[in-house]
Amino acid sequence: MSYFRRRLSPIKPGEPIDYKDVDLLRKFVTERGKILPRRITGLTSQQQRELTLAIKRSRIVALLPFINAEG
């Protein structure tokens, strides 16, 4: 039987997630521009919701692309 090590949250609880912090947001987006799921990011459910909103806002303001077509 294998055991999985619990991932520590990369963002501290209570730390604000800002849509203008593009470097932070890119860590949670795939090469193709998709938002990574919570089981991979290791965030809490509230942090994941805030992150999703921040990424979507950032896309609307054109800080992040909707689709990364480089590949």
From Swiss-Prot:
HAMAP family associated with the record: Ribosomal_bS18
Keywords: Ribonucleoprotein, Ribosomal protein, RNA-binding, rRNA-binding
Protein name as it appears in the record: Small ribosomal subunit protein bS18
GO-annotated cellular components: cytosolic small ribosomal subunit
Subunit structure: Part of the 30S ribosomal subunit. Forms a tight heterodimer with protein bS6.
PANTHER family referenced in this protein's UniProt entry, alphabetically: 30S RIBOSOMAL PROTEIN S18, SMALL RIBOSOMAL SUBUNIT PROTEIN BS18M
Any Gene Ontology biological process: translation
Name of encoding gene: rpsR
UniProt key word Ribosomal protein: yes
GO MF annotation terms: small ribosomal subunit rRNA binding; structural constituent of ribosome
InterPro entries per the UniProt record, alphabetical: Ribosomal_bS18, Ribosomal_bS18_CS, Ribosomal_bS18_sf
The keyword Ribosomal protein appears for this protein: yes
UniProt xrefs under Pfam families: Ribosomal_S18
Family: Belongs to the bacterial ribosomal protein bS18 family.
Function: Binds as a heterodimer with protein bS6 to the central domain of the 16S rRNA, where it helps stabilize the platform of the 30S subunit.
